[in-house]
Amino acid sequence: MAENFFLYYEEMDWNDHIKRAGYQIWLEPKALIYHKESVSVGRVSGLKEYFMNRNRLLFIRRNAPSALTIMVFYNYFIFVVTPRNMINYIRKGHKGFSALLLKAIWWNLTHDKNSTDLGYPLN
């Protein structure tokens, strides 16, 4: 499992790499999993917003089937998702979240897709 995701999208990245390696993904329909959302970082936190946005872009960079897919996704993210999120941050009074979103985008523009530099202080 790639260590450069840290919080979000690591299992999706792992899943895509497993499938590309020729393995099958199976489902156990009787399995029951309990997942308490946002226990480790909180429902509203800068840490969550940064890594959710950073890793969404990183996932596409690592797993998109073509450069065209990456370009289409980046355009959608920059021109639709980013303005929508910034409006929501302002509307909800989440100070500093817009800067973290821009930092997440900048990280993806300035770091290799295999970089283990998380771009966020964890201590």
Which positions does each model-derived feature cover?
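Short acidic, glycine/proline-rich loop/turn micro-motifs
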Residues: 37-41, 88
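Residues that scaffold the ATP/ADP-binding catalytic core of kinase and kinase-like folds
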Residues: 4, 36, 59
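Non-catalytic, C-terminal membrane-associated alpha-helical segments of glycosyltransferases
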Residues: 47-52, 67-123
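Mid-chain, well-packed structural core segment of small domains
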Residues: 62-63
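Histidine-centered active-site/metal-ligand motif
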Residues: 35, 53
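A short, conserved alpha-helix in the catalytic core of glycosyltransferases
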Residues: 2-32
